[in-house]
Swiss-Prot record:
Residues 1-15 are cytoplasmic. This is Uncharacterized membrane protein X69R. It comes from African swine fever virus (strain Badajoz 1971 Vero-adapted). It is a single-pass membrane protein. It is found in: Host membrane. Glycans are attached at residue 51.
Length: 69
């Protein structure tokens, strides 16, 4: 469901934003890919996915607190 919402928003933005703002289009393509990969994971893999993603974006180790029951 989340993937479809991101795809619809990306399509709307791509129609509204001119082509010279290619970075906005690239951002939504990356977001679609990340959401697609995230939805394929189970609950424990999702926890590790966000730890790895936040660590990669910030440049140092980040620990996301998660209560996985």
């Amino acid at each position: 469901m989340l993937l479809y919402i991101v795809i619809i928003v990306a399509c709307i933005i791509s129609k509204l934003v001119p082509n010279e703002y290619w970075a906005i289009h690239l951002f939504f393509i990356i977001m679609i890919f990340m959401v697609y990969m995230y939805e394929k994971l189970d609950i424990h893999q999702k926890y590790q996915f966000w730890n790895y993603t936040m660590s990669g974006l910030s440049g140092h180790n980040v620990q996301v607190i998660c209560k996985c029951y």
